[in-house]
């Protein structure tokens, strides 16, 4: 188990839009991560666009800034503090990116990363395209595909140093959706909550079926969210994933790998 990352940052009172960049900077500094100096301003503009677009389409359940500061932006960026996890100029795919988390904040904070945002809904990608253009992010590409289909596509299969996901799927499911995208020597990175412990053994068995090695867990403490149990689990890619994985769309969720007595 790794070192607990992050530390508290004071102040939870409501803030005006003009104060967003300062609050973001304070939060980023509390994480003790390296980030591009323009990151706070760009994340503030990202949040403004998210708030506007969310009025006409369901991108996220809550656009309150104080909630989003911890649960979206700092949560997305906290793993940058894990030594060696995000190498310089790494290629990264965010699978099932939704409103862009965690991939777009990572691309904003680390312009050296080559980032692909993949999602199955075109309307979400339309929003992300608008944000990427507004922020001038030349290190971001968009892909319209389901994870299972993308993981079998030779354009994307085993093409990335990192595959990340912040969804609510169980660890064995995330292993099957992410590891096919990862080069041998790279890692899948899963953002997980309290369920991580109970999913650990099945996740490890699933990872081995997919060419993965021993799972690595790092607890995370987010500024202002000290009561939120959170961790990052890295799945190293040791061998190529056999051709049968990922299985067809929907199957990983219905029949997760790594279950006792299962596949």
Residue spans of the language-model regions?
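Class I SAM-dependent transferase core
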Residues: 2-89, 93, 123-140, 248-249
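Short loop/edge segments at beta-strand edges and connector loops
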Residues: 37, 144-146, 216-218
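Conserved SAM/SAH cofactor-binding pocket of Class I
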Residues: 74-169, 175-176
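Helix-to-beta-strand junctions that scaffold the AdoMet/dcAdoMet cofactor pocket
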Residues: 110, 182-184
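Short alpha-helix immediately C-terminal to the canonical SAM-binding loop
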Residues: 124-126, 196, 200
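Short "lid" loop at the C-terminus of a central beta-strand within the Rossmann-like core
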Residues: 148, 193-197, 222
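Conserved beta-strand signature within the Rossmann-like core of class I S-adenosyl-L-methionine
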Residues: 185-195
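SAM/dcSAM-binding transferase cores
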Residues: 203-263
